[in-house]
Swiss-Prot record:
Spans traversing the lipid bilayer: none
Reactions it catalyzes: RNA(n) + a ribonucleoside 5'-triphosphate = RNA(n+1) + diphosphate
Lineage, highest ranks first: Eukaryota, Rhodophyta, Bangiophyceae, Cyanidiales, Cyanidiaceae
Matches recorded under InterPro entries: DNA-dir_RNA_pol_bsu_ext_1_sf, DNA-dir_RNA_pol_bsu_external_1, DNA-dir_RNA_pol_su2, DNA-dir_RNAP_su2_dom, DNA-dir_RNAP_su2_hyb_sf, RNA_pol_bsu_bac, RNA_pol_bsu_CS, RNA_pol_bsu_protrusion
Annotated protein name in UniProt: DNA-directed RNA polymerase subunit beta
GO biological process: DNA-templated transcription
SUBUNIT field: In plastids the minimal PEP RNA polymerase catalytic core is composed of four subunits: alpha, beta, beta', and beta''. When a (nuclear-encoded) sigma factor is associated with the core the holoenzyme is formed, which can initiate transcription.
Function: DNA-dependent RNA polymerase catalyzes the transcription of DNA into RNA using the four ribonucleoside triphosphates as substrates.
NCBIfam families: PRK00405.1, rpoB
Top-level EC class as recorded in UniProt: transferase
Amino acid sequence: MRDLIAVQRNSYYTFLTKSLKEEFDKISPIVDYTGQLELHLITSKMELKPPKITPVQAKRQDITYSVGMYMPVQLWNHQTGDVRQQMIYFGEIPLMTEDATFIINGAERVVVNQIVRSPGVYFQALWDKQHVRTFEATFMANRGAWIKYELDKQKLLWVRLDKNRKMPLVIFLQALGLNLQEIKPHLTNREVFERSWENHAVNNTEAALVEFYKKMRPGEPATVHSAKQLLYARFFDPKKYDLSEVGRYKLNQKLHLDIPLSVHILTTSDLLAGLDYLIQLCLDRARVDDIDHLANRRLKCVGELLQNQVRIGLSRLEKLLREKMTIGEKLQPSSLLNPKPLTSAIREFFASSQLSQFMDQINPLAELTHKRRISALGAGGLTRERAGFAVRDIHPSHYGRICPIETPEGPNAGLIGSLAIFARVNRYGFIETPYYPVKKGQVQKSIVYLTADVEDNYRLAPADVKYDREGQICSPIVAVRYRQEWTTCDASHVDYMAISPIQFISAATCLIPFLEHDDANRALMGSNMQRQAVPLIRASKPYVSTGQEKWMVQGVFSKADGIVRSVQATSIRIQHARGPVDYALLKYQKSNQDTCIDYRPLVWVGEHVVKGQLIAQSAAMDSGELALGQNVLIAYMPWEGYNFEDAFVISERLVYEDVYTSIHIEKYETDARQTKLGAEQITRQIPNVGEHALRQLDEHGIISVGSWVEAGSILVGKITPKGESDQPPEGKLLRAIFGEKNQHVKDSSLRMPNGSRGRVIHVRILSRDQGDELPAGVNISVRVSVAVKRVIQVGDKMAGRHGNKGIVARILPRCDMPYLPDGTPVDVILNPLGVPSRMNVGQLFEALLGLAAHRLRKRIKIVPFDEMYHKEASRIFVHQQLKRAALSAQTILYDGRSGEKFDNAVTVGMAYMLKLVHLVDEKIHARSTGPYSLVTQQPLGGRAQHGGQRLGEMEVWALEAYGAAYTLQELLTLKSDDMEGRTATLNAIVKAQPIPRGGTPESFKVLMRELQALGLDVTVLQLESQALCVMQSKLD
């Protein structure tokens, strides 16, 4: 089975086994300021203690799933010759689960791969305002200063270090101790360099060093010693300058050097070879670099990102240790070492980095895609505002590496992508894609992985080239890709051939059948919307698929060969050679997006299973294949205008037969806190609540599992002590008259919110008395999970796999839906106008082939890009299948209401439609009264804040255009932020009096105050042009 998340797993494994020790080795030994004490970290004996809990328990307890790191540490005292050794705890490192996720504080997170410029050397040609060409070479390090060579229009050489002022390159080379005789042998053309030498050279190295220092630190006294120190610190100190193994590999490759990969600093050979290449470039003997080519961009996967964080943490730890290391009698390694700087750096990364993301868990495809995502954003990457078109654009080198289709719409377009289906990442972080080698026109059986720079040197044939059983290419002339251009060549000159027509697209995109007949924009929407499909109660496989669904599996796999001994809803027991193993199945667990994670067994008692076999599948799967939607009978026709603008008309069958019903799990939580007036209590004794409302609570006041709850139902009964000031006036009166004490508690129970109903499936009680970890001031925490069944309704969003999305506008009774000549009513009516302008004709092929498959009682798998077989292969194949099923592409339909024929034949088909996570239940919102913003006194915005509908600029313009002056004034004052007017209006409505006129809006007062704060005297003038301080009095 193809491992689609190997990128994540391999990277993290390298981090734990190799990179972690490397970082500790870099700081060991730590020597104090006197040189008397040395702290040695013995990384060879580092131990990682496995976690005591499982990932499921970590989620349940809201803790981090991590490994403890221990290492022996020796403290050497050179004064006494004493060596003390102790095993030291270095903190916790989050451990990746089997599914390549991390559990941080109970939440499942994913670390996204970052695509960055590779360290190395880059050559560019620039055009100035006079259209004269100049050249530059940039040495980019993984960590440390950049060096930029510049060759101007006078053919003089300059160098710029980081963003400092430029200086003559000759001075820089002389400061490094090089003279003309040492430089000349490294250059193939010496005239350009000699001109610069004559113009800029100084007498000796010392003078060059002083000149260098003056340029780098103008205004500071320049000495040879300080210049040497600066030069060393900038480019030759491994702690401050690091090319990394990748940078060294790229430099060697570009400049044809053979310096060992362990050398991570710049050498004079690098600098002189770079200079020689720049001069060759100026003479048109070399090529400039394309910075968007994937040879020059690499992936930083989870392991490398974590390694960088560990480096930051260890540098902080090293600084802290140096300050603590003072000679003392009882000094022990344990008293010196505090792992906090290291653990806080790692925690900081997982909690706040742009690349550590809350996992998209709507369905198995969304999870998989999230783990294979590539982002150009994040620390050390690009920002949305700075990224231009070139970075976002599709590049020829993306073929087989990064999907050209799957990317978000909007500001992140092109900055966030997805790995192609067969792509893998090599040890340097460069993406490779597989090819079949071709020798003398014969395709070999073996597979070779090539990086983007290697690929450019070969002639590559596409996957749809025909070849016979022996592998011999049939056509004498073949279209090939060579140096990123398409050309033709003799079959015997082909070097490699792509392995599949779908190798250039991502996991989500390769699930779209007839992809080649869709416009790219719609294919993009189709890819993205499949990730938003909600798992349904009854999953069913598509009639028309691409055959890739079996790779997108999610579930439980057998760890070894064996025989199934028992199968239950919650576990499967398999007898392996080493003994029985119980596999726990997740039942009705809440995902990050509130969808339901529910595993169903796929095996029966007595079945022989093999290692790696799927024994239980998740909710959005059917027979071990991904099943995100349902096959429904669709018709492309207008229906009374209800499917105007992409809306759908659907049949009641989809509601009553639970075709598009999904289960969502909502979590409600309440805490019993310690307040100043006493502790809150969780109890059944709630003041002023009848017995009927308490009927489902147990003796402790907590809802029973299995109870059906509606809006307003009490989930957890809770009372809070209240003070004297909280007493209502009638309470105070009673006390004043009778001296009685009425109840000193108020009802603060957890209730079901408006618009929600469902069944309680889990109740979890966390108590400080039972040793559970709770925040300060919390004694008891109760969590209630409610499963909500959501049937499809008007306002829900549906979509096909081709970007054909829409909202359900009307649900018709079955008897009113148009029906086929055999009496079968249609399930969904789509607008035919949604096809031509959108150019996603793939949906028609899918619908018609699906209808034929349904009639023939079979499922059809068709790989995209089937034109390799012959011209118009898709159309011919669909017609063949329709003919075999004795069906026509268009059918006479009858109106369900009148029984009459429709005037024209209608395209009817069986399409695979998805219900998306944008459910109307979570969007519908209304406000009568609610919270207001403190400063402007305008209603808050958004459903979460119970906000109002904003009347924006354009709406104001529309009302102005209609001259609706009174309506406009009401909207800007009484209904918004005129505080006095609001209260007066409420009283007027209650007392059935005329609505008062609007006063001054609060936001206008804020504007006045801001202008006054600037020292401007603002007054309001009446038409009689006499100044009235009306505004002033109101403000006062």
